């Protein structure tokens, strides 16, 4: 299944860069995995996923969970989604639902969001907090394993 991993985030806003850090580590560790990083969100995400059968979007979230907690959402399997703070204007799930209405033929059939609960997205800095760093490593390992096995497990 033709898959792309999209990391969303801002590298100078600490934990908000988690998705981009995942992509950077994938490029270094597993260059066979197609991946890209986006900073602006919405339209940039929709454009990056065109032509793929599966998209895995990794983003920092603020849902009230413990920092570093990893959550997985199969977008097609849910009509309701938890309220998740996004610093990118429109949250990722809403972006994908909008894409389905506008570009239904070009959207990947499988859409997975991996959210990493952020601790600090307001302070400026290029390093993530320690719990988010650990979560980034777990997500990278999971995506690499998925690329070998062809599936993705629940965290």
Regions flagged by a language model, labelled:
Residues 1-120, 126-138, 142-154:
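N-terminal catalytic or cofactor-binding beta/alpha core of small enzyme domains
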């Amino acid at each position: 299944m033709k898959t792309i991993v999209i990391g969303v985030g801002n590298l100078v806003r600490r934990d908000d860069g988690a998705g981009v850090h995942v992509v950077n580590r994938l490029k270094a560790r597993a260059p066979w995995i197609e991946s890209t990083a986006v900073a602006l969100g919405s339209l940039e995400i929709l454009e990056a996923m065109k032509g793929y059968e599966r998209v895995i979007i990794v983003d920092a979230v603020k849902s009230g969970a413990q920092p570093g907690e990893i959550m997985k959402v199969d977008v097609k399997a849910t009509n309701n989604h938890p309220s998740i703070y996004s610093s990118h204007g429109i949250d990722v799930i809403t972006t994908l639902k909008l894409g389905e209405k506008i570009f239904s033929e070009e959207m990947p059939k499988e859409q997975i969001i991996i959210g990493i609960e952020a601790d600090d997205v307001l302070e400026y800095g290029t390093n993530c907090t320690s719990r988010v760093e650990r979560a980034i490593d777990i997500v990278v390992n999971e995506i690499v394993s998925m690329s070998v096995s062809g599936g993705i497990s629940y965290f």
